[in-house]
Amino acid sequence: MKVAVLGAAGGIGQALSLLLKTQLPAGSELSLYDVAPVVPGVAVDLSHIPTDVKVAGFGRDDLNGALTGADIVLIPAGMPRKPGMDRADLFNVNAGIIKVLAEGIVASCPKALVGVITNPVNGTVPIVAEVFKKAGTYDAARLFGVTTLDVIRSEAFVAELKGLDVATVKVPVIGGHSGTTILPLLSQVEGATFSDEEVAALTPRIQNAGTEVVEAKAGGGSATLSMGAAAARFCMSLVKGLQGEDVVDYAYVEGNGADAQFFAQPVRLGVNGVSEILPYGELSAFEQKAKEDMLATLKKDIQEGVDFMAS
């Protein structure tokens, strides 16, 4: 099993790489790529951790070396959010970065499972899809926007609010990966009920949790550690799927288009990526209205990615 992390020297990339070094199956390879000159040092640092996962670092000019033979590619590369910015402000900077990296994947490992972490995910995932389409190698089952951070935040906040064991809390989160497009389905949380007031307070807290971190770090970073943990968790779901285990997780994928071309929803994972897109169940009246209200924003975000490639 070879996993490549593109943008491995950044805050998310280093946290993610550390977790993968300790969690990937024995005998795996972890390939770290970044344009920052520190990346070989990150690889050396991680290589001192005694697990049976081989680590190699690749600099700016060796994207092909990092990607060749990769089964899974995770992309946290790009500029992080700063105070006063929302995810959409990042689009103009990160769209170009994602395009270049996607072209590298097409050239070096077109059959890999690709997990896009670079924000704004609503728009960067369509860019990757368009790059693959242009090359004639697009397979929707192999492309994922990683929205796991919304899920783990929801789990943490619900457990805290209700005094539950967080290990038992499961919160479905559908839609997109920014602002109101993030839709936690609190009505479906087993073992907990929420008042209308709690739903009205908790939903925006989950949606704006990224801003909470950016402001708390006072210009010193964004949600790097929790995002690293979320990406590692999603990567391990992909690994289990590749190993033939029956795994269901949430991700932003191209489905049947019932809601939007790309939509975060439950998916069954297998040896070829998505083996089945699952229904997300019945919504409460609050959730139904929230979904209807955000679809125009989500579709606009998706179109922005498509238009970027068309230009």
Curated annotation (Swiss-Prot):
Highest taxon of source: Bacteria
Entry EC number(s): 1.1.1.37
One biological process term in Gene Ontology: tricarboxylic acid cycle
Ligand binding (NAD(+)): G7, A8, A9, G10, G11, I12, G13, D34, N94, I117, T118, N119, M227
S-S bridge residues: none
Catalytic-site annotation from UniProt: H177
Record key words, sorted: NAD, Oxidoreductase, Tricarboxylic acid cycle
A Pfam family this chain is assigned to: Ldh_1_C
Catalytic activity: (S)-malate + NAD(+) = oxaloacetate + NADH + H(+)
EC supergroup of this enzyme: oxidoreductase
Binding site for substrate: R81, R87, N119, R153
GO MF annotation: an example: L-malate dehydrogenase (NAD+) activity
A Gene Ontology cellular-component term: cytoplasm
Family: Belongs to the LDH/MDH superfamily. MDH type 1 family.
Subunit structure: Homodimer.
Function, in words: Catalyzes the reversible oxidation of malate to oxaloacetate.
Protein name as catalogued: Malate dehydrogenase
Source lineage: Bacteria, Pseudomonadati, Pseudomonadota, Gammaproteobacteria, Alteromonadales
